[in-house]
Curated annotation (Swiss-Prot):
Designated name of the protein: Probable chorismate pyruvate-lyase 2
Stated role: Removes the pyruvyl group from chorismate, with concomitant aromatization of the ring, to provide 4-hydroxybenzoate (4HB) for the ubiquinone pathway.
Keywords for this protein: Cytoplasm, Lyase, Pyruvate, Ubiquinone biosynthesis
Protein residues bound to substrate: 76, 114, 166
Length: 183
């Protein structure tokens, strides 16, 4: 069951109307977002942790991870920044049982990028990217805005699945317009 006002995550094939070409490119780029942001910022990239801890996962997250509703998992919320500006809000989740059995220490990442870890470990397989207009009330207070594009994908390694959602903030689009040669 979805929370009230929960988004309907869609693959590109079900997306209508399509966003503009630049937005579409950022949403469905299958490479490392960390690397792309690092390039856009001319190496002025950083990660600011906002929350890390055990929480009851949202129903849409449980469904995406094939977990029972109300399952507990590790939640990590961060800002991905370019030159100190929050460009992306990211929320990564994994079930308690899968993390405890796998040895991935999400609680030890600190200001390091989870994305880099996922892309450097070739044992992780990425599933299809899904997108939505992310619910405003799910964003941190300082970043709340209606209609922001978000994307998510699931990374699997054996019994471990990590769901990574990335919400593109207006400051990212400003940077993209200002530095098209870095995109």
């Amino acid at each position: 069951m979805q929370h009230t006002n929960a988004p309907l995550w869609r693959p590109q094939s079900e997306l209508t109307p399509l966003p503009d070409t630049s937005t579409l490119d950022w949403l469905f780029d299958e490479g490392s977002l960390t690397r792309r942001l690092t390039h856009l910022s001319d190496d002025g990239f950083s990660v600011t942790p906002l929350f890390e801890g055990w929480q009851t996962l949202r129903d849409d997250e449980c469904a995406a991870l094939d977990l029972a509703e109300g399952s507990e998992g590790w939640v990590r919320e961060v800002y991905l920044r370019g030159h100190g500006q929050a460009w992306v809000f990211a929320r990564s989740v994994a079930s308690r049982s899968a993390l405890q059995g796998d040895g991935l220490h999400m609680d030890e990442l600190g200001s390091r990028s989870l994305g880099e870890l996922l892309f450097c470990d070739h044992a992780f397989q990425r599933r299809a990217i899904e997108v939505c207009h992310y619910p405003e009330h799910w964003l941190p207070e300082g970043s709340r805005a209606a209609g922001l594009w978000g994307r998510r994908s699931r990374f699997d390694r054996g019994a471990l699945s990590v769901l990574v959602a990335e919400i593109f903030l207006p400051t990212l689009w400003e940077a993209v317009r200002a530095r098209p040669e870095n995109c």
